[in-house]
């Protein structure tokens, strides 16, 4: 497969053992970063996307997988860990998150209430808000199954179940 500049795509690891180890570059963005003196060396990683045939290519992803080198947890194991909390199956408005501060506020109509490690029922609708850095700082537990959920726009993201222990506020409507 090729990206929207015709460069062959490939697997690009971005984070390994909790450290940033790579970037996604289009040819254009790599050249611009070098020209502006922000970095010394960069080449295309086969990661160019376009929003249309008249728009310039930008760096992006077409198939992003969140995985771990550690063994993931089953759904049942994660329920035991949650004890009291919520299972959020999808959110709306994630694109409105502040990329600088990490603050986000999203809504969901697909949320389950968990008490004592068991699902007790659905919440009709809720708002979720918090700060991504705070939500991630106490560690993240990943599920053992990555499920492709389709593609939106020019990219898609495949996520296992993700357990955030703190840093998230749930505001049932």
Task: Briefly describe each language-model feature range.
Residues 1-173:
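N-terminal small-residue-enriched
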